[in-house]
Amino acid sequence: MQEKSLQFQIARQCVFFVAFLFLAGGLTACASAPFHLAPPADVYEDAIPTGYGRIRGWADAAPDNLEALLEGRAALLKRRFADTIAAGQPIRLSYLALSGGGQEGAFGAGLLNGWTQSGTRPEFEVVTGISTGALIAPFAFLGPDWDDALKEAYTTMTTDSILIPSILKGLFGGLALADAAPFRRTIENFATEEMFRLIAAEHRKGRRLYVGTSALDAARPVVWDIGAIANSDVPGALKLFHDIILASASIPGAFPPVLIKVEVDGKQYSELHVDGGVTAQVFAYPAQIDIRDIDKLMPTGFERIIYVIRNTTDRPPYENIRQRILPLARRSISVLIAYQGIGDLYRIALNAKRDGIEFKLASIPVSWDMEPEESFDQKYMTALFALGERIGREGIPWRSRPLAADSEAEIAATN
């Protein structure tokens, strides 16, 4: 089956770029780009977005104020679940991690809608999103009241509403092969002030919404606390929310990086942020954090479940590859992305096992064989949404291991 997602189209164009490298090299000096001054290497970890406090962290390390965060978290949980604690019952918490996948995010959007219809969808204490998962995450966080808006987002999306091709500009010194202005407008249409206000309210209750990006200068994954941003009262906070979602889904080469202003010791700098999928296809929490540490601060126990929705199949489908540079490059990148995602799933599953959290995974059935005709194919996305919705409504075949799919159950789900 041919994979026609945006990542693979970009692979083709990148190879094309190499062929024109010397021709374009003489012209790149004339190209313009936003001024970018990265923080010095010895202080970059201390950078904070200009005007904000602690609204983000590194996804590959525990925060330096972890003890204070755990104590604050315990205090919130004691207030929220006072009745449960008084009754001597365990606190039940559900977490949701949403992966990348481009237009295949329609599956996750449909699954959430169908899950609501089944009457078994829980309220999620924490929601995380990467790339297309970052687009879904705010809707999932706010619950079933936003299902219709989520459906609209993923069944009306088209290539024209996401990008404007600018291949020649990209080849001759530009920052990308496409203009992301339509994508920003699409994000602004769905990530509204009302959504932002409601995220802030849920954050104050103790729930958390996190979005992942990749900091190119630092070559590290970044986790943004969207609720903290929404509660910051900093002018332009809504724009930063839009910037983060755009960055999380900005495939390098396809879209330009998103420049975010930061400061260190009163000095102004900037960072380049791109697709969270560059550093992780899906994330939950850093392995350096042991969730059980919070249990020691609580008078009762926990029952925790982490649900992972992977917006792709387990592995790339079998394909007879032509021995040409473009098919070889496309297939190699496809396999690289797929196995990066598998590694991420194993990390989440192992951390969950260590911390006593039940792990549940759902992904696109291996029997799904419809092919998209373009980068964001509305017909394809609508069909994939419908598949996810039906699976969610009829009963999601959750798996307890990253690659332990029950093939018969998956095949039955698509029949």
Residue spans for each PLM region:
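N-terminal secretory signal peptides that target proteins for export/translocation
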Residues: 1-12
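Aromatic (phenylalanine/tyrosine) cluster motif
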Residues: 8, 16-22
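C-terminal motif of bacterial Sec signal peptides marking the signal peptidase cleavage site
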Residues: 26-29
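Patatin-like phospholipase
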Residues: 31-125, 141-415
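Catalytic nucleophile serine of serine hydrolases
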Residues: 102, 130-131
